[in-house]
Amino acid sequence: YKRQDKDGIVDDYIIYMLNALRQNASEIVAVVNGTLENKSKDKLLSITNNVIERENKGFDVWAYKTAIDQYGWEKLVKFDEMIMMNFTIMGPVYPLNEMFECMDAKDLDFWGVTKFHKYENGDPFGTIKVGYIPEHIQSHFIAVRNSMIKSKQFQNYWNKMGEINDYRDAVGKHEAMFTKRFSEMGFKWDVYADMGEEYNNHPILCATREMIEKKRCPFFKRRSFMQSYDNIISDTFGQSALEAYNYIDQNTDYDVDMIWQNILRLENQADIKKNMQLNYILSSKSSNIDAGIIKARKIALVMHCYFEDLTEYCLHYASMMPESADIYITVPCEKNKEIVEQAFKQLNNNVQVIVIQNRGRDVSALLVATKTVSYTHLRAHET
């Protein structure tokens, strides 16, 4: 199981996944590209005593090779099956024994959970020797059976694995070609959750709910919730992540808080907002809120008024606040302070104008100049 994290943290979804795997695997090796914080390393050690921390190079490919080299072929050929799996999938949303029992009944040499359909319109990575993306098992989960583990072809593949310098190398030298290479050698393969030609090239991303609901796919991609929106909108209406999230939340036992724990720590909030359709339109009509409730609230409005000619605009905005709200305006010089103070005299609010250095734009106005404004229940920020 390969994992990497820029902060060296192992989130709860990883532990949940490994605990589920432990019920179906006799041994687990956790390979970390990078270093772990002590608390996170202890988490992994609670699952397996074989935790490898290595330099963050070679992507998944060399993480797997590192584990293979540690075991050696003499030991590996004694296993019925070897799984190569990474952290880019979350789950499981169903018991994994369902999948393993289903695939155990099939006469195969290697198998996976999902596949990427053939893409004939060229090689977008520029590293795939056949010039297109062949149909292949997606590399987030590939299981190799003993018949293939003990083969010279498979052993030579890993013994002679070249350097992987970037993501394009990883795709061209391993991910996109692994299935085609060994299939042409006569090894039989299949996937557990196959939508066939019903959907596009990447069903686990673009038809996630259908994969879970109709094909009982136990996993989903963490990238679903924060990928480039341009990628997903070319194949869908943008609904895939939210539909999948709602289905998982409402129809499975999977704790969706584990999704948020990871993506909020690591990913761009703008990407999360787009993929999860977190768009809200406030009503133009005022609600009948008890004036006493508003008065009891401690509200601060922080405004950065850099240009003198924005004074009237800021005043208009601030005048919409309840009189109980405190108003803090940051300005770049004493001259602007005098102008703003004069303009804001007409308000009954507690108004404070603060001169700040011309550094950090509006962010410093919020995080530095008004950092002591910590007593509020609600806080607004306007530039």
Residue ranges and their predicted role:
Residues K2-E382:
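ER/Golgi luminal nucleotide-sugar-dependent glycosyltransferases, focusing on the catalytic module
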